[in-house]
Design a protein with these regions (language model features):
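A charged, well-structured terminal subsegment
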Residues: 3, 64-93
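Conserved phosphate- and dinucleotide-binding cores of soluble alpha/beta proteins
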Residues: 1-71
Length: 93
């Protein structure tokens, strides 16, 4: 799945969803796969995770860099999602 996608869309879910999300974030962050859109749909669901990433991983622990925050986008805007996916670059890895 990870190597054939041209964008990654995640909807609210459980441990499996979080596992897949962090696997893709890690692969992109470490340059093992091309950077492609990672879209988290459902702002109310994803906001606490986003706050944890910003406050704990970035600010308190320093285990990620500020540029890592640009690896994903959180939105509920369907038109924006369609536009991002339509304009996603083709894979080159």
């Amino acid at each position: 799945m990870a190597y054939s996608a041209e964008a990654y869309l995640y909807f609210p879910g459980g441990y499996g969803t979080l596992d897949e999300l962090f696997e893709i974030l890690t692969l992109v962050q470490t340059g093992k796969i091309s950077r492609l859109p990672i879209i988290l749909v459902g702002a109310a669901f994803w906001k606490p995770l986003d706050e944890f990433i910003k406050q704990t991983l970035l600010a308190e622990k320093g285990t990620i860099s500020e540029s890592d925050l640009d690896l994903y986008i959180i939105t509920d805007d369907e038109d924006k999602i369609v536009e991002i996916v339509k304009n996603a670059p083709m894979r080159n890895d």
